[in-house]
Amino acid sequence: MPMQGAQRKLLGSLNSTPTATSNLGLAANRTGAPCLELPIPNGLFLSLGLVSLVENVLVVAAIAKNRNLHSSMYCFICCLALSDLLVSGSNMLETAVILLLEAGVLATRASVVQQLHNTIDVLTCSSMLCSLCFLGAIAVDRYISIFYALRYHSIMTLPRAQRAVAAIWVASVLSSTLFITYYDHAAVLLCLMVFFLAMLVLMAVLYVHMLARARQHAQGIIRLHKRQPPAHKGFGLRGAATLTILLGIFFLCWGPFFLCLTLVVFCPQHLTCNCIFKNFKVFLTLIICNTIIDPLIYAFRSQELRRMLKEVLGRGRW
């Protein structure tokens, strides 16, 4: 699975950069001018993937075992963990296959390798799309729980959540198959970028609106109990900080990846863009880091889920 150019494959060619890495250094571009390249050691990449794998397996197992967690909110959190698990697992699998092929340990026909390569690409792409969709679904679920609190349980029923989950998975797999099949069309990469921006805007609008409602609610409590204004100010700052961290992590971890795909469309031959393409594995590593952070933000803050995790780990059985 050698690198054939940044525009050759949606995820395949960009992800199949040479796996042998060295310390931080400068790589030459096509004219010999220096490019800053940040090599990611395979050991580090696989270790991060393993941490993500274990972490998200624990989340899925804890939610599956506890009936108290069988609600629409935890359904979306469980599916986010499952999609993050597949993101890290598929990237680990591809890296392992590349290493085995380069070492000569895995010897098979080129057609089999290509078929495996395409399958992993579809799995990686679909799990990434699912991860983004479930981040958006969690934001929508929380928005409804705040603005339609009295009707929340009638709106966000478990069957409806399950139908939404099924629709997301089916749409992601079908879209990924089309994206990988027609990887050489610029519209494919542009669609992915538009999808990322849509999710970013959706999350930003919903969470900002939720923050505004929370501040309004806090202000009402202050007036009711005649507390001092600094308490309200402190709440607003904490809420703004939480929102900044949540959206900042999302943009930092996913933004470079989709920016790289956009540059493949607009400047595939430009020297600066080619320097950016050389760091594609860094962008994938950021996504793996996001799959590690997601459970900390969305799952482990739940006291009930933490208690269930302690039971799962304490008993040593699923």
Curated annotation (Swiss-Prot):
The chain crosses the membrane at residues 38-63, 73-93, 119-140, 164-183, 192-211, 241-266, 280-300. The keyword Transcription does not apply. Pfam families: 7tm_1. Residues 64-72, 141-163, 212-240, 301-318 are cytoplasmic. Interacts with MGRN1, but does not undergo MGRN1-mediated ubiquitination; this interaction competes with GNAS-binding and thus inhibits agonist-induced cAMP production. Interacts with OPN3; the interaction results in a decrease in MC1R-mediated cAMP signaling and ultimately a decrease in melanin production in melanocytes. Keywords: Cell membrane, G-protein coupled receptor, Glycoprotein, Membrane, Receptor, Transducer, Transmembrane, Transmembrane helix. InterPro entries: GPCR_Rhodpsn, GPCR_Rhodpsn_7TM, Melcrt_ACTH_rcpt, MSH_rcpt. It is a multi-pass membrane protein. Disulfide bonds: none annotated. PROSITE patterns: G_PROTEIN_RECEP_F1_1, G_PROTEIN_RECEP_F1_2. It is found in: Cell membrane. Belongs to the G-protein coupled receptor 1 family. Glycans are attached at residue 29. GO terms for biological process: adenylate cyclase-activating G protein-coupled receptor signaling pathway. This is Melanocyte-stimulating hormone receptor.
